[in-house]
Amino acid sequence: GLVGSEMCIRDRHICGVTSDNYMGALQAATLLIRDKCDVLIHVNADVPKSIPAYDRIRAFEDTCQEYHVPYELNLNVIGDSYQDIFAQMKHIFSDIDEKYPDKKKGIFLANDTYANMFLNLIFQKYGCFPDSYELVGFDNSPIASEAILPITTVGQQIDLIAKTAIELLVQQMEERKKRRPVSLSKPCLLYT
């Protein structure tokens, strides 16, 4: 699903369209639980709670707690470039690999770029994809299908996100033409 939101910045209303981060993360965690992973780990940046993407963290944690599954939040991804993030991902991979050597590790990564980095690190160490790992990305970006092995990913309907964003922009532009413009109504939740 998609979420439309409106925020006020210096008395200006700005709308945003985003995917349903909570539902996507819930689906990812549920898949890893269903596939009998011994421990679930979510790899992400330390996202502020006010950002819609924080719902990925919240849903992952809620789902693991609901099903009483051991889990870890690794919110240590930082960096301003691919190289910086890849270097950080090496540390994260090493930590996970050393901490859970005899466990099936279900890794939910915040996006498909992170998932591809993690997949490459697994292959660099093991030369294959061992049964002790399962990865899920988020975005359904081309990198997920073009990786050394296709990556399971939570799909975002980019075409629908774009269409909804354009509709909101047109609606705002039409409203501004009026003598007394009215800001858009409350945020709406769109399911697809």
Where are these regions (language model features)?
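Short beta-strand elements in bilobed, periplasmic/extracellular small-molecule ligand-binding domains
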Residues: 63-83
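Hydrophobic alpha-helical segments within soluble ligand-binding/sensing domains
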Residues: 16-42, 85-94, 115, 156-174
